[in-house]
C-alpha cells in the first residue's frame, strides 16, 4: 500500500481526501498534517504527499522537501511567482505535480477553450467562475489557468489584457480584453464558464463540479501515479496522457 500524507488535513479538500482514502485499495493515510505539526514525521512516514493548504503552507512544504525529497502532489491555489519558481527548482530532485484543478472535465474544458480561442479570433472572451462563500482567493486558480490558455492561444500576454472588474463609465471594451470575473455564495463547489461572444452569436463552454470528491479522487489517483515517477515537473496533461484516456 502506498502511504499518502495529507498536508493541510483540516481544510475542506484535506477532509475530503481523508474520507476518500478510507475506501482506496491502493493507498492509505500515513499522516494527517496541519500547521505546527511535525514535518519530519510527515516526510519519514509518507511515500507521497498531497498538499491542499495555503500559499504560505506550500512555501514551507517546498522548503522542507529540499532536505528530504518526496513526491509532492500540489493543488493549493493562489501561488505567486516566487513559490512557482521554488517549485520548479525543487522538481529537479523530486517529482512534483501541480494543477489548479484535478478533474478530467476541467482538463478537457481547458483544451477546448484554447482551441476555440484560436478558431474564434474575432470573438470577445469573458470568463466567469463561481464558488462557495468560504473560498478565500479570487479569481480561482482554475479561472486563471483558463485565462492563460486562451490568451496564449492568441499570442497575448494575459497580464496586459486581463480585466478583473468593471465599474462606472469605462468606455468600450477593447479588442483583446479578457475579463475574469468571480462570484461567491452558498455552497457552490465550483463552476467555470468560458464565453466567446460575437455580433449575432456566442459560444459558452461550462464545467460544473457538484462534489469535492471529484477533486479528491483525482488527487489520490495522481498521487499514486506520481509516487512511481522520476524527478521533474508534471501537469494534468502528463497524467491523462499516461492513462491514454484523452489526448490533450
Swiss-Prot record:
Keywords linked to the UniProt accession: Amino-acid biosynthesis, Cytoplasm, Diaminopimelate biosynthesis, Lysine biosynthesis, NAD, NADP, Oxidoreductase
Binding site for NAD(+): 8-13, 75-77, 99-102
One annotated GO biological process: lysine biosynthetic process via diaminopimelate
UniProt GO cellular component terms: cytoplasm
Disulfide bridge positions per record: none
Subcellular location as annotated: Cytoplasm
Catalytic residue positions: 131 (proton donor/acceptor), 135 (proton donor)
Cytoplasm as UniProt keyword: yes
Primary residence: cytoplasm
Enzyme Commission no: 1.17.1.8
Pfam families in the cross-refs: DapB_C, DapB_N
Positions with a binding annotation for (S)-2,3,4,5-tetrahydrodipicolinate: 132, 141-142
Enzyme class: oxidoreductase
Pathway(s) served: Amino-acid biosynthesis; L-lysine biosynthesis via DAP pathway; (S)-tetrahydrodipicolinate from L-aspartate: step 4/4
Reaction(s) this enzyme catalyzes, per UniProt: (S)-2,3,4,5-tetrahydrodipicolinate + NAD(+) + H2O = (2S,4S)-4-hydroxy-2,3,4,5-tetrahydrodipicolinate + NADH + H(+); (S)-2,3,4,5-tetrahydrodipicolinate + NADP(+) + H2O = (2S,4S)-4-hydroxy-2,3,4,5-tetrahydrodipicolinate + NADPH + H(+)
GO molecular function: 4-hydroxy-tetrahydrodipicolinate reductase; NAD binding; NADP binding; oxidoreductase activity, acting on CH or CH2 groups, NAD or NADP as acceptor
Function of the protein: Catalyzes the conversion of 4-hydroxy-tetrahydrodipicolinate (HTPA) to tetrahydrodipicolinate.
Protein name in the entry: 4-hydroxy-tetrahydrodipicolinate reductase
Organism in which the protein naturally occurs: Campylobacter jejuni subsp. doylei (strain ATCC BAA-1458 / RM4099 / 269.97)
Amino acid at each position: 500500500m502506498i502511504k499518502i500524507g495529507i498536508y493541510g488535513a483540516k481544510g475542506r479538500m484535506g477532509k475530503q481526501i481523508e474520507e476518500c482514502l478510507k475506501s482506496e485499495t491502493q493507498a492509505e493515510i500515513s499522516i494527517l498534517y496541519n500547521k505546527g505539526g511535525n514535518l519530519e514525521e510527515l516526510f519519514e512516514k509518507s511515500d507521497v504527499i498531497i498538499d491542499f493548504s495555503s500559499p504560505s503552507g506550500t512555501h514551507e512544504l517546498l522548503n522542507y522537501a529540499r532536505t528530504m525529497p518526496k513526491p509532492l502532489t500540489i493543488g493549493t491555489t493562489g501561488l505567486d511567482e516566487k513559490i512557482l519558481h521554488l517549485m520548479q527548482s525543487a522538481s529537479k530532485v523530486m517529482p512534483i505535480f501541480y494543477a489548479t484543478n484535478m478533474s478530467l472535465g476541467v482538463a478537457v474544458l481547458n483544451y477546448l477553450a484554447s482551441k476555440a480561442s484560436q478558431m474564434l479570433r474575432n470573438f470577445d472572451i469573458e470568463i466567469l467562475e463561481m464558488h462557495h462563500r468560504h473560498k478565500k482567493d479570487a479569481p480561482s486558480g482554475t479561472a486563471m489557468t483558463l485565462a492563460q490558455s486562451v490568451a496564449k492561444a492568441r499570442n497575448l500576454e494575459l497580464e496586459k489584457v486581463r480585466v478583473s472588474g468593471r465599474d462606472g463609465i469605462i468606455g468600450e471594451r477593447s479588442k483583446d480584453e479578457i475579463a475574469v470575473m468571480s462570484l461567491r455564495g452558498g455552497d457552490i463547489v465550483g463552476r467555470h464558464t468560458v464565453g466567446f461572444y460575437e455580433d449575432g452569436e456566442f459560444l459558452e463552454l461550462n464545467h460544473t463540479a457538484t462534489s469535492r470528491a471529484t477533486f479528491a479522487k483525482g488527487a489520490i489517483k495522481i498521487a499514486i501515479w506520481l509516487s512511481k515517477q522520476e524527478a521533474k515537473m508534471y501537469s494534468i496533461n502528463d497524467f491523462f496522457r499516461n492513462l491514454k484516456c484523452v489526448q490533450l
